[in-house]
């Protein structure tokens, strides 16, 4: 599983400086994350930089919703040619932004509820421990 959204370490230079999408090439193969920061991609991380004024959040959601056929044996991996062969729709940017805005808000609500559930589970565990000691 990805920790810290796949971020690891620090650098004093950057290879990617604008909005982009990273896609994991190994491990959690094909998992896309929209990036709005400067970074240096390492190991098996594929970086996608839009050629047009597209919404990277929208395309990260689209990639995550797309089945990508992984043909490797042994350790699964995703290569640039495999990812490049995936065809996606490209709606107008205004529609991309509306869709991604809705999905980002939904994800924020889901994360908030997940944090609440974790807190409630800790309270329950604490209460059970106190009840049965």
Which residues does each predicted region cover?
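Amphipathic alpha-helical coiled-coil/heptad-repeat segments
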Residues: 89-133
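DNA target-recognition domains and sequence-specific DNA-contacting regions of bacterial/archaeal
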Residues: 1-90
